[in-house]
Amino acid sequence: MATKKYELTKEYFFHGEFWHQLDDNKGRFSARIEYSPYHGLILDYCISDSESPRTCEILYGVLNTGERCTLIGKFDFTQGNIHFGKGIIHTGRHGFPIMLFNDFYAPDSKIEYCDLSLHGLQEFIHPHGFFTQLKHLEHPIFIAKGNHWTLQLVNHVSFSVIGDDLLNIINCQNKAALENIIHQLKKTKELYPDAFFSIRKELVFYFRIKSSNDLGIKDHISKCWDISGLFSILLNKPTLPEEINIKFKGNGSKTPCLLTTGFEQRTIDLALREIKHQLLPINRKHINLGKIFCKWFKIAERYMPLTITYQYETGFRTLHQAHTDIILFATQLEAINKTIGGSKNEKYMKPINEYASLFLIQEIEMFFKKFNNKSIGENIATLRNELAHVDRKK
């Protein structure tokens, strides 16, 4: 059965009934769930039953779409509005971080794998409009292994039924060649009368994340953010999760997931802006993704401030943001220098010489030559110190 698609950059609204015991729905109450990428998940509730929970870690529910769902968070319904009369009624709006579809899941439910698709990933892999050049692969395109983690780049293909109408969509200027193909197809159909043809409709790439020590939902989602954070740097723009689908052990189908993210509208617009494979600063042809992810999983936490800067980019800069970014980037250069064994005197230039392209180095040199003839390293150090200390002359 096909998994229903829930995209994290779109808006959704649901009505449903909810309760807090996995095997007992007494004390259930009515609520509306609102989801948007900028406000996240919000439960708009009305509780009148004395057996309904006042606080809980998890809620189970059925939606007006006919789906089961599991809401994960810390729910405290005593913090909303309380109405007194013939009974006590609790109402309010309560945010929560995670919503799972299709079934009821206990907090300790075991995960087989988690599938992540990212905005821009398809274009990063191959130019849009030329996907017929690619073959569907049953095996992973690459496998990267980290500490207790395995990451695979896999593809999924969907087909549309065409049957005997396959002959109607084939054409060739060489009439003899066309007649030969039609003849061979008819002959094949005679040999295999039960054969039923379909044509590829869509080929989609996504990451598959597996844990070797049964880590939970929040750990898998954290790893999703590590992956999208790296792609934000590679693509030089916010790269947001498009879909997250979790495969629980013992469950026949994957479970869609919505998350509270809290992105600004300008960040979402920038993330959804169309990109071109040929114009990207880096695409799949330029790098070894498997090797990069093996290293990234070891250092992702250290560079979280940098990835967050890229992921929450809006395309606009205030003076405060510009100053903050300069200090942050200088600090990251120092961290990279330490990683590659550079000395204190080369803390800015060694990382640049090691990893920057000649074009980038020339652009930085041209910028600083407007002000002086000092080296790039000296100018970065001066600029960083001017901004980091209030009393320094700017």
Segments predicted by a language model, with ranges:
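Long, contiguous, compositionally biased segments that the model treats as domain-scale units
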Residues: 1-228
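Amphipathic, oligomerization/interface secondary-structure segments
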Residues: 2-5, 248-251, 258-394
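Glycine-centered secondary-structure boundary/capping sites
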Residues: 66-68, 73-74, 148, 236, ...
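Basic/polar, acidic-poor N-terminal "presequence/leader" segments
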Residues: 196-270
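Generic hydrophobic, helix-prone segments enriched in Leu/Val/Ile
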Residues: 31, 151, 231-232, 296-297, ...
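Helix N-terminus capping/helix-initiation residues
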Residues: 117-119, 124, 215-216, 236, ...
